Regions:
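A glycine-rich helix->loop->beta "capping" turn
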Residues: 45-50, 69-82, 88-93
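Conserved glycine-rich Rossmann-like NAD(P)H-binding loop of the short-chain dehydrogenase/reductase
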Residues: 21-37
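Rossmann-fold cofactor-recognition segment
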Residues: 44-61
Length: 273
């Protein structure tokens, strides 16, 4: 099971839970020191040292290198958890020419998924499909995503984050249409408001800090990810979940026509296909 954004937050919490349950986990993270700490925590939980790979999703060549290394190391991948994400204040385009938030939160994971697609398909069995689980957010509701130009610079980091979360859900919708027949089930989920460094930078924190009961731990946020990665009842192609239950998303984030347009433009943006 490959988990991106695994060096902290819900990615790390999910990796620990999966390892504790006996699963072989592969960690992908950006910061070498935090990634090393995550390896130690996952090893303590599962009794085995997990493989780890470093990649900064704001640099697509690093994603390509990590994807190639993982594909070379594993003949099959049962689960890909696309959890890497960032609410970045960087307003300049990445070296690849894209909005930084959109590249980190959408295009990087989209590229990695395609690089590992053969390994996911190799793991698929008639009654036990491979799975792609993507972390979404309520922020999709305020996104201003241009599905024909996903890397277009957004006017604020909040709108960029919302657009990237729209893209996550739309990609799940189209992945389900394309890949369910290959034995790959794509789902996504909203983890809730998380008590972490990432969560404290969200616009909801200014309100939620006065009602601390609204915030959840990283472990609680990761629960639905782990469920979607492992439970037979979670095999709902294109499903959007929260708290282990179906969770509605806006029409803009679930429109099949928009999903297909985004898929085509994203392939061009990451130079795939």
């Amino acid at each position: 099971m490959v988990v991106t954004g695994a060096s902290s937050g819900i990615g790390l919490a999910a990796a620990v839970a999966l390892a504790r349950a006996g699963d072989d986990v592969v960690l992908l993270g950006r910061d070498p020191r935090r990634l090393a700490d995550a390896v130690s925590r996952v090893r303590d939980a599962g009794g085995r040292t997990p493989a780890s790979y470093r990649a900064d999703f704001s640099v697509l060549d690093e994603v390509r290198a990590a994807g190639a290394a993982i594909a070379a190391a594993y003949e099959r991948i049962d689960v890909l958890a696309n959890n890497a994400g960032q609410l970045t204040s960087v307003r300049r385009p990445t070296a690849d020419g894209h909005d930084a938030t959109m590249q980190i939160n959408h295009l990087g994971g989209f590229l990695l998924t395609h690089l590992l697609l053969d390994r996911l398909q190799a793991a698929a069995k008639p009654q036990v499909p491979a799975r792609i689980v993507t972390t979404s957010s309520l922020a999709e509701a305020w996104g201003t995503l241009d599905v024909d130009r996903p890397g277009r610079r957004q006017i604020s980091r909040w709108l960029a984050y919302g657009a990237s979360k729209q893209a996550n859900i739309l990609t799940t919708v189209e992945a389900a249409r394309r890949w369910t027949g290959l034995g790959i089930v794509a789902t996504c989920f909203f983890p809730g408001l998380i008590r972490s460094g990432f969560g404290r930078r969200s616009p909801a924190f200014s309100v939620a800090r006065f009602a601390p009961g609204l915030f959840r731990s990283s472990e609680q946020g990761a629960d639905t990810l782990v469920w979607l990665a492992t439970d037979p009842d979670a095999l709902v192609p294109g499903g959007h979940f929260a708290w282990r239950a179906p969770f509605p998303a806006t029409g803009r984030s679930t429109d099949p026509a928009r999903a297909q347009r985004l898929w085509r433009s994203s392939l061009a943006a990451v130079e795939q296909g």
